[in-house]
């Protein structure tokens, strides 16, 4: 942390899905490597960060978590805006959460930019006995809609890391092949050329807190 | 239809219907006035002066379904073939959106010329009518309303009681009413059918139910004397909006809430109705208006009866529910201001309280006799004041109902123990209860009115009412008012003094004050000692509703008293089951109707809360967006220990 930035990119992620599918737990598991057993349900908006490495590049993931998409319309718009990656989560033990995916997907498509990478996550994979949605059908749904797909468990940590990493890889790949224009206003990616005055500084949070441990 | 057809053709058809039964089936394509493209729609149906409202179809997406009926007596003119006044033979349909705050919103209106309809030979016609804008306003697409109109003879099936008709001569159609009245007395043809289930069940409805179920209220009974009417299922659901019940004040909490919000509606309505409406409207008006100031006023004096009621409420606030079935439905936001006023919390000795109530109740029963029943010894102070005031009040007060309400309020305000007493009383004097309830509603309405209705010019009404009242009121007053007034009058004074030795007295006083105020309001000119207090409230003469029914009621009242007493006994028996400390105690004494009212009130409260929550959410929403865009770091989850508890 001697340099202003110890990462090259900031990717903005969002997590969407029905209430109770484990969005916040996924975030917490990813950022803290812990499982919140009785996670209170999220009311407002918050985000967590973690730096990962993809192809030798340090990338800071800024993962936004929210609830109440129904009640906070303005927040929701702002929430989706400029997301480079979206984790669309359902609960494999509750079919209704799976059935709602198409509406979540519609929102994501409408409110994010075309290059936003969307990964479908079937959470609570540890509850195999209560499974209500098969892996196969979800996989098919993902393929039909051009989504990445993983089943994960925020409780055990299974595939949680991979979910975030897979999306990051895809985004980075899009950057490399030029399909994602970093200069686009809402790309959801900030490039930090190792200098504080990096290119497009939008309103993204500054990374100065990195390593401060608070 | 077949009948009509067979009867023959031409305006002077063979059969002449005496009644017309109007069933409001549904509407569609209504404009959305509520959140989410919905409306809380209800329809007001009116023929001549008679007016009924349907229940509120909540959250209807432009297509509410009511299926509620009302039966109107047709002007003889129609049947005889002579040309009846157009207004008297026109069915007016008005669809409104019940607004949580402010005036109800106009959704559309339609008029049906019953003469023409009848000329068409059809005995029954179900048809969609296009809803139009108020006269003079540009037409919009307002949807349509489906109504089933059925002409009948000898309407024995009237589902609803017409409370409104009896006594008002105010309306332009007074003549018609007179005729009707005559009929009612003789035949007991209650043409009424009101439907006003909306927000808060109307007092009237309660009365009806009572009469049906318990027949407690003598006065009411007279109105509903016909058994057939009582049977009708709809009756409960409908309440007469503009009613002028003989004894009771017509105002209902629901009314206040602005069912009638639209100005246009008022215009259409008959004068009597309009008065009522105005009151209601006023009540519905915004809190922000000056009238509210009264509420906020810490001083009891400044407060009108409303304030008094509130004060009572405050003491009782924990149990909003009232005694006797006169629950006070506390009005939510305003309560705070009331609290200040509220007399020091009394732990009233239930017993003493009871006695009092009993006296009052008995008195009420005896009310017919003009004499003022001396209240319990505790009341002495009140009496002093009361004497002078009573006279004035008598003159001024056209509406006996207010008083009862006030008393009811006081009771309500009292502790649960008081409740018991109150219940007894209520039972005894169902009339009173109804009045009380009406009073309550009035009070609440007044509050609202005062708040919202600054702009409305009501003062003239009061004077008019006085004149009317003078005649009509006397009879009523004698019965009920006389008994209570002394108390009330005295009470107000005491309240002014500010310290009542007896907690009960305080409560009563507050009630009395309220009543006095209410009285004063309608009749500002009357010089009452308390006038200064009342004046603040005065602006709203509405509280005084046109209670025209006098004579018929009296007769009934006598009968009613006996029944009431028995009921009281029954109620007492029932009440004993609950300990005063039991939260259920307050509710145990409520009648079914009261409970319904309570539920409706609660629902209203909840919807208001929801609205507030919504506002807060919107605020947070916007705030969050700003944070997200400008200082998102604030939203960052703390790295180490998350805000969230429960980590493993």
UniProtKB/Swiss-Prot annotation, chain B:
By its UniProt entry, which Pfam families does this protein fall under?
C2, RBD-FIP
Region Necessary for interaction with RAB4A and RAB11A, subcellular location and endosomal recycling, as annotated, extends over 584-648
Where is coiled-coil annotated?
none
SUPFAM superfamilies reported for this sequence:
C2 domain (Calcium/lipid-binding domain, CaLB) (SSF49562), Eferin C-derminal domain-like (SSF144270)
Concerning Gene3D superfamilies, the annotation shows:
1.20.5.2440, C2 domain
Q: What's the superkingdom here? A: Eukaryota
Kindly give the CDD domains that the UniProt entry links to this protein: C2_Rab11-FIP_classI
Where is the stretch described as Disordered?
164-470, 483-503, 516-555
Q: What is known about what this protein does?
A: A Rab11 effector protein involved in the endosomal recycling process. Also involved in controlling membrane trafficking along the phagocytic pathway and in phagocytosis. Interaction with RAB14 may function in the process of neurite formation.
User: What is annotated about its quaternary structure and interactions?
Assistant: Homooligomer. Interacts with RAB11A, RAB11B, RAB25, RAB4A and RAB14.
Comment text on domains:
The FIP-RBD is involved in the interaction with Rab proteins.
- Quote the protein name from its UniProt record: Rab11 family-interacting protein 1
